[in-house]
Amino acid sequence: MNDKNEISIRQATPDDVALVLQFIKGLADYEKLADEVVATQANLAESLFGTNANAEAFFAHLSSGDGEPVAVGCAIFTQHYSTYSGNSSLYLEDVFVLPEWRGQGIGRELLAYGAGLAKSRGYPRMEWSVLDWNEPAIGFYEKLGAERVEGWLTYRLSGDALERINPSS
């Protein structure tokens, strides 16, 4: 990135739903999980902007002064609650920077923006998960000062397992 480029962060608007989905698919491709993306523009719009919206998306834009800013990164956050702390926290669901723009401070700006959101809302922390093979991301997070939460595993009920535990009537 040269000196003329500036990073700015802005919240997604309803007009950005297709772009948010594009970033989600880019992350899924990188994580070798493209087959798992079933999100649509319609359900994403509802999650981000509907009556019961439960997520927020933000873009990192790069502007060089010679045209419209270009979205080069995206982060999606949700609220999480901890009974142990008795507080909500900010959960980083996704963060993705386009490959050609990595290593230039864009991911750091997105996480710093999230940290600012957490602080402004009175949340004591921001948390997220990372695939265990994603060493570049792990190194990046640890360089920022994030700590691995030892002793915890993530579990998920979905599909048939979700149906078996609570059969539809």
What is the role of each PLM region?
Residues 77-88, 93:
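Conserved donor-binding loop and adjoining core beta-sheet/short helix segment
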Residues 21-47:
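Conserved GNAT-fold acetyl-CoA-binding loop/helix
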Residues 46-59, 91:
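A short helix-loop-beta-strand connector motif used in the catalytic cores of GNAT acetyltransferases and
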Residues 108, 112, 120, 132-151, ...:
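Conserved active-site alpha-helix within GNAT-family acetyltransferase domains
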Residues 95-102:
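A short, internal acetyl-CoA/4′-phosphopantetheine-binding micro-motif in the GNAT/acyltransferase core
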Residues 8-20:
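A short beta-loop-alpha structural element at the N-terminal edge
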Residues 59, 68-78:
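Conserved beta-strand in the GNAT
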Residues 119-129:
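Conserved GNAT acetyl-CoA-binding A-motif
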